[in-house]
Amino acid sequence: MSVIAGHHVPRSNDQRQYDTPSVPINIAPDSEGHIHEMSRLKDYEVIEKLGQGTFGVVQKAKSKKDGSLVAIKQLINHSAKEGFPITAMREITILKQLNHKNILTIQDMIFEEPKMSNRTDIITMRGSFYTVTPYMSSDLVGLLENPKIKLELGQIKCIMQQLLKGIQYVHNQKFLHRDIKAANILIGQDGVLKIADFGLARIYHGNVPRLGMGPGGGEKAYTGLVVTRWYRPPEILLGERKYTTAVDLWGIGCVFAELFTGKPILVGKSDSHQAQIVFELVGSPLTWTDAAKLPNKNEYSCGLACKRSLEAKFASIMPTEAIDLLSGLLTLDPFKRLNALDALNHKFFSTDPLPLLPTQMPKFEESHEIDKERFKKLKDKEQAVSELKPPTEIRYDNHSESRYNADHSTFGGGVGGKETSFSSGKSDYIDHYEPRARRDHYEPRIRNDNKDSNDVRGEFESATRQEQRRRDIQNRLDAGGMDTYIPKTTTAKLREHSGTESLSKKYDNYQPINVSRGSKSPSPSKLSSISQSKADLISKPSAPKVASRESSLERKQVSNGIRTTTDVEPPRARARRPTDMFGRPLTSNSTQAQPTRNKSVERPKDLEKPTNGVTEDRNKKPVLEEKKEVVKPNLAIPKIKKSSSLVSLSSRSSTTPVISNPSKVTKRAASSVTPPVLPKKPKISKTSSESEVSDLEEDSDFTGENATVFERFMALEQLQKSPVYKRIINEKMRFEKLSGGHKSM
């Protein structure tokens, strides 16, 4: 395939006067006017991936011949029937006829032969085609997502002026772009804007736009599966098929507002929802006379009660002239919508500040749509630091507090259960404010002190803060003088670098307090005797007194040891742990052994330790097993239910079904008898226009306009002399031959 340089469709004299200045195509044909043999991928060094769309994958590369940076786009073949993608053929055919500085041009074509193990693989493994275009350092999505870039009004005017000039040239050549969005608008380091991705572009029939005369076209029906939903105009949402050049101006209006907001303004989840938010912004469809005649009545009816909010929404971020231009671009009636010539003559471009020249534009950091996630993380990080940064200096002590940073608790993180990633410790945060003295500055007191009635902080603290301080003091007293708490942030860092095992080994050598020399932590066998309740020891007449003294001594050691147990959980969690009748926190063993006042708890067999005078029969305990209970059939309860409790063999059998949770079962039974009547949610009808942007269903064969495109693409006599043309014809013949032979088999 070859591209003939300088080939244009004949135009009338009245069309030339609306053309903007153009630049020559950067293609060097041979003496016969043909481009030489197509390049190979090995002629380029791929650097990185720039993005991926519906019709191809774009990569940044460097030419090995001259060292220039280029963008290589792989043409994806969606249909196995096509030897060459029809969308790529249409894009190349249209770009061959466009020659403007604000339109992206094709420099080269690449063809890669398929790697086949046998001759039949050509049916599934065809050669790959690539287009080579000049490398553009940024696209509009990347610039708007980059937190380091803030567009000024003069820069916005320069971008909009170039965009309108480019789309005006496209419309004067009688083409519809049909996919205007921020991702398809590219900006180079020289400040020149280029419109890209003509995969959905089509020729239109009718008059070209004139100044003050509305849009052009509207004489032929097209598919409605065009334009990305967030930039889709209301006429396509309502089912119009004979649309005009106004569909591109609606997308430009959305991009114009996005330059001020930094994000898309009309983000719909479906076509019905998209139509609703459009009507909420620009007003009810009742103001548009022909809207009621369009086929999509569901989208029409959802906006009847909507009121216009465009001016109120953008009044605080856009000047008056910009709002007036935006209102003209986002007009419901496409025949009243501004065309490109009308927009270029708007007073927005003639008021101060004037639009910058492309050479005056700054050299922005390289920003593409693929960098969107990276920019989002960077933006969230900066926002978190700015929100948590205190207004005055920070005392670099993990336990210092002040009324100016009272939103952060003593232990790091937010107060009242609010999780934050900020800690006022020196290792986590460095403040750059210069310290300055204040008259009301005070020395931070230690956490064991009681609240002083003369403390000025009491005037600025809430009840939640005071309650937190009392809880901290109580936790400090319960710790027995030894601070074994590790801040959460430090613990997290230790776990990241060395894991939880090294953290636990760090405290293995800690010894209990108030224990005689040579004594160690109680063994598991001694813990079993400690777990016996006081009532059980008294009930054994043959038990010697020495055993009771030993058990009381061991109980005392354990109670002292509990206070020095290495516990890295926050003091708030320790405060919520259950305690015994003496206020001591319970461990897993002590919790199991703690008797209740009104109910006796039987001792497990494996924890009992036989003593002198106590027989084996007395220590025996009935074997416990799970019991299946038969439950009467009910609407809410199954016939057979497995009991979750353990039932002794000596217990009495009961015919009454045991219900583990009567409240839940009662609710279930009540709900089964009288089910609540839930309001029905309105169903959103999904029409054919809900599909993604595609034009393949109606153009899957070479009939109708596609045949005209192909004939126009291949009919030139000079084109047939090209070796690229011969390569495509040969591959097509091989495919038809092998495909026909494969079917006959």
Swiss-Prot record:
One of its GO terms (molecular function) is protein kinase activity. This is Serine/threonine-protein kinase BUR1. It comes from Candida albicans (strain SC5314 / ATCC MYA-2876) (Yeast). Residues 692-701 have a biased composition (Acidic residues). Residues 44-349 form the Protein kinase domain. Serine/threonine-protein kinase involved in transcription regulation. Phosphorylates the UBC2/RAD6 ubiquitin-conjugating enzyme (E2), leading to monoubiquitination of histone H2B and the silencing of telomeric-associated genes. Also required for histone H3 methylation. Necessary for the recovery from pheromone-induced growth arrest in the cell cycle G1 phase. Required for pseudohyphal growth and virulence in mice. The keyword Cell membrane does not apply. InterPro entries: CDK, Kinase-like_dom_sf, Prot_kinase_dom, Protein_kinase_ATP_BS, Ser/Thr_kinase_AS. Residues 1-21, 380-701 are annotated as: Disordered. Keywords: ATP-binding, Kinase, Nucleotide-binding, Nucleus, Serine/threonine-protein kinase, Transferase. The active site is at 179 (proton acceptor). Residues 380-406, 428-475, 493-508, 547-557, 599-631 have a biased composition (Basic and acidic residues). Its EC number is 2.7.11.22, 2.7.11.23. One of its GO terms (cellular component) is nucleus. It comes from the Eukaryota. ATP binds at residues 50-58, 73. It catalyses: L-seryl-[protein] + ATP = O-phospho-L-seryl-[protein] + ADP + H(+); L-threonyl-[protein] + ATP = O-phospho-L-threonyl-[protein] + ADP + H(+); [DNA-directed RNA polymerase] + ATP = phospho-[DNA-directed RNA polymerase] + ADP + H(+). Residues 516-534, 632-660 have a biased composition (Low complexity). Residues 558-567, 586-598, 661-674 have a biased composition (Polar residues). The keyword ATP-binding applies. Pfam families: Pkinase (PF00069). Belongs to the protein kinase superfamily. CMGC Ser/Thr protein kinase family. CDC2/CDKX subfamily. It is found in: Nucleus. GO terms for biological process: cellular response to pH; filamentous growth; filamentous growth of a population of unicellular organisms; filamentous growth of a population of unicellular organisms in response to pH; flocculation; negative regulation of filamentous growth of a population of unicellular organisms in response to pH; negative regulation of flocculation; positive regulation of filamentous growth of a population of unicellular organisms.
